[in-house]
Amino acid sequence: IPGLIKLSYLLNTDKYDDLIIGCLEYEDSLYSEEYHNWADLRQEGDERYQACAWCHGFGGITASRLACLPYAGVELEQRLKQDLSRAESCFLSLQMRKGMCLCHGNLGMLLLLDKFMEYNSSSGLKYIKDLLVMATLDELEHSHIMPQEKYAKGMMNGMAGIGYACLKLAGVDSLPDIMLCDI
């Protein structure tokens, strides 16, 4: 969706609006008011709404909506903001995960939360971020990195991404925003 919205913006056309709206409607159909999350289609039953990662659940939806926002017209902007409002409750109930990777670990969610807080910050979100930062630093200091992340060198699932996240969270602003695919 971000690619289509940016393309429409750059070409100054509404040619893709129906397609964009259709994609947003499909993703919105996967949202559950009961669970305050988007479905992970790999799972069945209640498990479908437990994902909180960049790759599945509210994390990816949040990243997509934040990436779209600068290029959206007024009508689309309202739809995006509705989803971002939904995402806030997901962030407020965020809990530590076992992994640290960008794709589905703590550092990925911290980067998304940090980006989200540029859009909408609250004392509750700051509290959650502070807790996650402290817990994540403790895990990293004690080398509690899952083997599949420790021995993987990749960006989204490995040590390159963990290093990238540490730099971003330390305030290095010159790096592209990988989580929003701003490369």
Which residues does each predicted region cover?
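Glycan-recognition and catalytic cores of secretory/periplasmic carbohydrate-active enzymes
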Residues: 1-183
